[in-house]
Regions:
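Catalytic cores of Mg2+-dependent Asp-rich isoprenoid enzymes
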Residues: 2-31, 35-44, 218, 222-236, ...
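Interhelical loop and helix-boundary elements at the membrane-water interface
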Residues: 2-16, 62-88, 106-113, 128-153, ...
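The first (N-terminal) embedded transmembrane alpha-helix
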Residues: 8-29, 85-95, 152-161
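Central hydrophobic cores of alpha-helical transmembrane segments in multi-pass inner-membrane proteins
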Residues: 21, 25, 44-63, 121-128, ...
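Helix-coil boundary and interhelical linker segments in multi-pass alpha-helical membrane proteins
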Residues: 22-43, 95-114, 160-184, 240-252, ...
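Membrane-embedded alpha-helical segments that form the functional core of polytopic membrane enzymes
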Residues: 35-54, 118-122, 174-198
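Solvent-exposed interhelical
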Residues: 48-89, 189-232
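Transmembrane helix-loop-helix
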Residues: 83-131, 229-276
Length: 295
């Protein structure tokens, strides 16, 4: 049925995978670059689906039903388990294929490329405390104010930096030679950070009870919107304006790229009222899809 399909796509984090691919394709169009190999985009789709679903691995029949998403994972735990297994195997196969195919190009990459790749990988590992919680007793998911910026940074790296590294591997050309990608990276970093802050609003009651010092817990809902989200959106908009001026965007191009910022601003003010979980999964994440399409 329609509702089951919606639940599967959004609760199962498949929409997140679509967003990762769309943002990466948007970057290529914005910078006028060739697209990456299809197999890379398949791997890019699978990786965030696997990663975001990991947070729900411990849900079982005895887990209290906190919301519709928890209920869906509890009712579909076998489907989730085997789909995770299948996607992990496929993902390993894809990246093994890419390494084998481009081995000579990969080993000739500058050290900075490896630093970026492993840096993002370690942030991802530390975010869920896969290693850090056992060794150091912490994870980045509980890092308070920095949490949203970390999420935004990782998303911006996946959307703007990894595709450029992959293009270097595929073509042998350096696509970091201009400053254009920097302004696009900053815009996406701030945009995705705002998106993460708005998602924290969804978890405001539980984060407050767990003493997680997110922006909304620290400053309250209204101050977070007016003094955190709005300034970050303005900073992201300034970065985009610089990018648009350098690229000499037409009025139509500029106007289309403004739409996601205006939508995000409207959504931010709508957060003054409580909404269902679907509002956060469809509307808030959906604005990232709008951003990719408008780009």
């Amino acid at each position: 049925t329609y509702q089951r399909s919606v639940n599967f796509i959004f609760f199962g984090n498949y929409f997140v995978g679509i967003l990762a691919v769309m943002l990466s394709i948007e970057m290529a169009f914005q910078l006028g670059l060739p697209l990456n190999e299809t197999v890379y985009y398949i791997g890019l789709f699978l990786a965030p689906v696997i990663y975001y679903t990991y947070a729900y691995k411990s849900i079982n029949d005895s887990t209290p039903i906190a919301n519709q998403r928890t209920r869906w994972f509890r009712e579909n735990k076998k489907l989730v388990h085997w789909s995770q297994v299948g996607m992990i195997i496929l993902c390993i196969g894809i990246f093994s294929f890419l390494i084998f195919k481009h081995f000579n190009e990969i080993i000739r990459l500058p050290l900075i490329y490896y630093s970026i790749g492993f840096g993002v990988l370690f942030v991802g590992i530390f975010y869920y405390g896969l290693i850090s919680k056992k060794l150091f007793g912490f994870n980045l998911r509980n890092s308070g104010w920095t949490k949203a910026f970390i999420i935004g940074f990782v998303w911006a790296c996946c959307a703007n930096i990894f595709p450029l590294i992959m293009l270097r591997i595929e073509t042998g050309q350096d696509y970091f030679h201009t400053d254009l990608w920097v302004w696009l990276f900053i815009k996406n970093w701030l945009f995705c950070t705002v998106n993460a802050i708005m998602f924290d609003i969804k978890d405001y009651p539980s984060d407050s009870n767990l003493y997680l010092r997110t922006f909304v817990v620290s400053f309250g809902l209204r101050r977070t919107i007016y003094f955190i989200i709005v300034p970050l959106l303005i900073a992201g908009l300034i970065s985009f304006c610089i990018f648009a001026l350098i690229k000499e965007f037409s009025i139509i191009q500029f106007s289309f790229n403004l739409i996601p910022f205006l939508l995000t601003l409207a959504i931010a003010f709508s957060m003054l009222r409580r909404h269902s979980i679907f509002y956060y999964l469809i509307v808030i994440d959906g604005v990232i899809l709008v951003k990719a399409l408008c780009g």
